């Protein structure tokens, strides 16, 4: 066979063979051969040989050399350059290498960190419900890490407890309070409850009373100070009105947090089976502090605090100790000594210390009613605590807080200036939606009570027209922006300064009583809110007398009708006279059909706050006289020109809705007509979304 080779090819084969013998096994002899073979040059046998040199590679990365007749002995140079496309691996071959067997890559399943967290959280929760050990649960959660997933822990904890007995529900609430600030930050608590509200529709499928139970958890979180009251209205705005989550928020606010003595009722709703009730713990803390102030035995006081076994509630010890120091100047030094010692022994953690100071700072306004110098004294205590090393400097009164306080004062000053302009514009335009937009643009919901105080103060010094507008606005704000607490706090501020107001406005006390009573009639406040307001005022003060007067007005005969007309129509006319004028202009419009003339007459009435009467009478006239299109055209034109606002439209429609049963006695199809009017109003944007929602809810109940 060598006769077929040229001298040059023989030499190349010799070199290749020698090189192959010297190479380690990992290097391939045929690759050396290929380096020495001449490049194809067009045709002939060289070209054919080159085309035949095709190498198959195994999955292991090795070239598989084809063998001829299973061998490749001496002189068989096909061993080096020939390939066999049908090469098969033979396990019985002496040269068999298992690494050349074909194999399949199998993808490994990657674990999801969130899934891992949820599994671990479920284990922690189940163990906690078995043992009731708060400290172990907190330690396990800290050890678990992945703090960004803590909202899911809250969702899991509450959702599991919802389907268990009251004991577990109470345990879940206690654990949430324990984890607050120390383990789970406030934003994560909030996010956890958002997840719960968003899942309320799913909970109802398995837990029939899920809305009520979740509402109670929400109320308990507010009472326990782990959720701010402002969370409720903000959550309600973010949720679809038809969702179960929205119902949860409404139930929490109206059924639990608006009741008299709601905090005590909510705290004891599940019986407190897990441990001593919160009220009992508070009483024990008060007893420990009172005894300590008398004896001055720091070690004994620390021992008693430790024996309470409520490390998650030590912020209450801090808060009550500080209140004691503010109330009794002689107690300040021993109280600070006690807190210093408790911090040094790690009895009270840094986060619990900060939380206690924060809670006191938030209640300074209320404390100032009984302790006028509370804010000043607290401002002196904070630097001592920070310099003593037992209050985190981030709390910040010495330096940062001073700057923040100045910024806060500046913000409040600007707010007061801006709202005066906004209120004046409202008195001129009666445009409630525009006022609400302006107030939202200020972005300071924490100052809502201040706005209410300024609104009524300005109205007091004006005519009945503006007083009626102020009451109407207050009702709208309560629907759109203000919480009941905002309104109550605003009236407290008004009544605290009632004596000063009376110096400028002689009848201020009587008119404030009317505003307060009117707020109750308009469902802005509940009657029991008057008791809460009175409890925050100095006994036997002008403010408490005003509240008593308001209460007597509310419970008088025909109080509702009288209070709704308490401002007499605003421009000095009797309400009945105003109604007659409105009836006359509508009848004239019915005869003439002149929309522009009717709008002119409405404008000349000069009673924008009473335009809901125009809406009501127009709708009723449309039903009675089958003048639907004519009356709807008038209302549309009035709305387009800005004569009748959304608020007045809504109020007019509401009044017609409330009187439908009586109307149906004379107009059998009154309800059908009214529904048609509502659809028309909805299409043209006349009425508020809250009104449409109330109609939907009433229909569902019916």
Curated annotation (Swiss-Prot):
Enumerate composition-biased segments (Basic residues). Answer: 53-65
Q: Where is this motif: Nuclear localization signal 2?
A: 615-622
Repeat is among the record's keywords: yes
Q: Which InterPro entries match?
A: ARM-type_fold, Initiation_fac_eIF4g_MI, PDCD4
Observed phenotype of the null mutant: Enhanced ethylene response, but altered salt response during seed germination and plant growth leading to an increased tolerance to salt stress. Increased susceptibility to dark and starvation, and to treatment with the TOR inhibitor. Decreased translation activity associated with altered ribosome patterns, especially in the dark and starvation conditions, in which mRNAs distribution is altered and rRNA abnormally degraded. Slightly early flowering time under long-day conditions.
Annotated Gene3D superfamilies: 1.25.40.180
- List membrane-spanning regions: none
State the superkingdom: Eukaryota
User: Per the Swiss-Prot or TrEMBL record, what residue ranges does the short sequence motif Nuclear localization signal 1 cover?
Assistant: 267-274
Entry's Gene Ontology cellular component terms: cytoplasm; cytosol; Golgi apparatus; nucleus
Induction behaviour: Induced by dark and starvation but repressed by glucose feeding subsequent to starvation in a TOR-dependent manner.
Tell me which residues make up the MI domain: 116-237, 280-401, 414-535, 577-697
Entries under SUPFAM superfamilies matching the protein: ARM repeat
What keywords are assigned to this protein? Answer: Cytoplasm, Ethylene signaling pathway, Nucleus, Repeat, Stress response, Translation regulation
Using the UniProt annotation, give all residue ranges assigned to the region (Disordered).
Answer: 1-100
The record's account of tissue expression is:
Mostly expressed in vegetative tissues, such as leaves and stems, and, to a lower extent, in roots and reproductive tissues, such as flower buds and flowers. Expressed in seedlings, roots, cauline leaf tips and flowers.
**Similarity comment:** Belongs to the PDCD4 family.
Function of the protein = Involved in target of rapamycin (TOR)-regulated translation control, especially under energy-deficient conditions. Involved in the regulation of the ethylene-mediated signaling pathway. Involved in salt stress responses. Reduced cotyledons size and early flowering.
The name this protein goes by in its record:
MA3 DOMAIN-CONTAINING TRANSLATION REGULATORY FACTOR 3
């Amino acid at each position: 066979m060598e006769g077929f080779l040229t001298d040059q090819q023989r030499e190349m084969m010799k070199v290749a063979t020698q090189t192959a013998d010297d190479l380690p096994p990992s290097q391939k002899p045929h690759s050396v051969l290929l380096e020495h073979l001449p490049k194809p040059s067009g045709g002939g046998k060289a070209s054919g040989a080159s085309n035949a040199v095709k190498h198959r590679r195994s999955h292991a990365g090795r070239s598989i050399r084809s063998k001829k007749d299973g061998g490749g002995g001496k002189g068989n140079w096909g061993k080096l350059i020939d390939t066999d496309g049908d090469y098969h691996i033979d396990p019985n071959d002496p040269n068999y290498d298992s690494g050349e067997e074909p194999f399949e890559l199998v993808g490994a399943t990657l674990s999801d960190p969130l899934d891992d967290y949820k599994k671990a959280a479920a284990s922690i929760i189940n163990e906690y419900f078995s043992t009731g050990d708060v400290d172990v649960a907190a330690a396990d959660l800290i050890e678990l890490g992945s703090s960004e997933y803590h909202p899911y822990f809250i969702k899991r904890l509450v959702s599991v407890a919802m389907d268990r007995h009251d004991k577990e529900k109470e345990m879940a609430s206690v654990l949430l309070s324990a984890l607050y600030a120390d383990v789970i930050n406030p934003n994560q608590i909030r996010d956890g409850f958002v997840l719960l509200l968003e899942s309320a529709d799913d909970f109802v499928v398995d837990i029939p009373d899920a809305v009520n139970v979740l509402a109670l958890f929400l109320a308990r979180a507010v009472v326990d100070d782990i959720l701010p009251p402002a969370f409720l209205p903000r959550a309600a705005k973010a949720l679809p009105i038809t969702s179960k989550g929205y119902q949860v928020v409404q139930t929490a606010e109206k059924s639990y947090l608006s009741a008299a003595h709601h905090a005590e009722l909510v705290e004891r709703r599940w019986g407190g089976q897990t441990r001593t009730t919160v009220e009992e713990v508070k009483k024990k803390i008060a007893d420990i502090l009172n005894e300590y102030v008398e004896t001055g035995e720091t070690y004994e006081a620390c021992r008693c605090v430790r024996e309470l076994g409520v490390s998650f509630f030590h912020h209450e010890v801090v808060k009550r100790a500080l209140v004691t120091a503010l109330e009794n100047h002689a107690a300040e030094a021993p109280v600070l000594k006690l807190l210093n010692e408790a911090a040094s022994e790690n009895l009270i953690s840094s986060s619990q210390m900060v939380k206690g100071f924060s809670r006191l700072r938030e209640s300074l306004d209320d404390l100032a009613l009984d302790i006028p110098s509370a804010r000043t004294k607290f401002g002196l205590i904070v630097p001592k605590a920070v310099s003593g090393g037992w209050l985190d400097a981030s709390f910040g009164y010495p330096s940062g807080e001073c700057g923040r306080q100045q910024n806060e004062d500046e913000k409040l000053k600007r707010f007061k200036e801006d709202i005066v302009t906004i209120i004046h514009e409202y008195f001129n335009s009666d445009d409630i939606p525009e006022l609400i937009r302006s107030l939202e643009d200020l972005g300071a919901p924490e100052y809502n009570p201040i706005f209410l105080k300024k609104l009524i103060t300005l109205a007091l010094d004006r005519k009945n027209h503006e007083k009626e507008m102020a009451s109407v606005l207050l009702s709208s704000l309560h629907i759109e922006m203000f919480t009941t607490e905002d309104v109550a706090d605003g009236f407290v501020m008004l009544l605290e300064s009632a004596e000063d107001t009376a110096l400028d406005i002689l009848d201020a006390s009587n008119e404030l009583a009317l505003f307060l009573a009117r707020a109750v009639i308009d469902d802005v406040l509940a009657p029991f809110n008057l008791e809460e307001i009175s409890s925050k005022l100095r006994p036997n003060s002008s403010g408490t007398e005003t509240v008593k007067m308001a209460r007597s007005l509310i419970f008088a005969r025909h109080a509702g009708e009288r209070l709704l007309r308490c401002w007499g129509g605003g421009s000095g006319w009797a309400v009945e006279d105003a109604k007659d004028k409105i009836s006359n202009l509508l009848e004239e419009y019915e005869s003439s059909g002149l929309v522009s003339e009717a709008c002119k007459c409405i404008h000349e009435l000069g009673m924008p706050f009473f335009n809901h009467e125009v809406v009501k009478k127009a709708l009723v006239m449309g039903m009675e006289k089958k003048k639907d299109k004519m009356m709807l055209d008038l209302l549309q034109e009035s709305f387009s020109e800005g004569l009748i606002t959304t608020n007045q439209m809504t109020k007019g429609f509401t009044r017609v809705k409330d009187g439908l049963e009586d109307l149906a006695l004379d107009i059998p199809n009154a309800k059908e007509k009214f529904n048609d009017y509502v659809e028309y109003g909805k299409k043209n944007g006349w009425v508020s979304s809250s009104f449409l929602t109330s109609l939907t809810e009433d229909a569902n109940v019916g």
